[in-house]
């Protein structure tokens, strides 16, 4: 199905030049595959627009200003394209899901992989999915 939606792309090169880079390590895809090799069940949850759930630090909103023919706008949430967006988002998801990491959840970029290794039971996998779903911080914003 063709999705006809707009995705804003803002040139943040000037902001990037003065941004202190977050050195948060992005997981290696081969580590992810090693982790999932024994999984009987797994589900990939795409946290689409996940960045839009992360609040910009108070006072930093003017740094995200974009000017259009309709006026100038500041983001209150983290837009796609900021240098530290991916690291910030991964760090947040790892903090929210800390107690489940490497038990039945892996965070990879803006995706969550929920997996079941120790049981062939679909019922057990569904329980894992519910636990993740009930981590409300993932699905709600201020």
From Swiss-Prot:
Could you tell me the keywords of this UniProt record? Answer: Mitochondrion, Nucleotidyltransferase, RNA-directed DNA polymerase, Transferase
The record ties this protein, via CDD domains, to: RT_LTR
Which Pfam families does the entry link to?
RVT_1
EC number(s) in its UniProt entry? 2.7.7.48
Query: Which coarse location class applies to the principal site listed for this UniProt protein?
Result: mitochondrion
> Where does this polypeptide localize?
Mitochondrion
Q: Which residues form a coiled coil?
A: none
Organism domain of life: Eukaryota
Which reaction is catalysed here?
A: RNA(n) + a ribonucleoside 5'-triphosphate = RNA(n+1) + diphosphate
Quote the protein name from its UniProt record.
RNA-directed DNA polymerase homolog
What would you give as a GO molecular function for this chain, any one?
A: RNA-directed RNA polymerase activity
- Give the matching SUPFAM superfamilies: DNA/RNA polymerases
**Got a GO cellular component term for this one?**
mitochondrion
């Amino acid at each position: 199905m063709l999705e006809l939606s707009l995705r804003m792309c803002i040139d943040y090169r000037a902001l990037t030049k003065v941004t202190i880079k977050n050195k948060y390590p992005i997981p290696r895809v081969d580590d992810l595959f090693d982790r999932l090799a024994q999984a009987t069940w797994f589900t990939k949850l795409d946290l689409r627009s996940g960045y839009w759930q992360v609040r910009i630090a108070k006072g930093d909103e003017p740094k995200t200003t974009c000017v259009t023919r309709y006026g100038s706008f500041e983001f209150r949430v983290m837009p796609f394209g900021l240098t530290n967006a991916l690291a910030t988002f991964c760090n947040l998801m790892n903090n929210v899901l800390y107690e489940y990491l490497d038990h039945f959840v892996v965070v990879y970029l803006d995706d969550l992989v929920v997996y079941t290794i120790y049981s062939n039971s679909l019922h057990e996998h569904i329980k894992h999915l519910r636990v993740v779903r009930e981590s409300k911080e993932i699905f709600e914003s201020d």
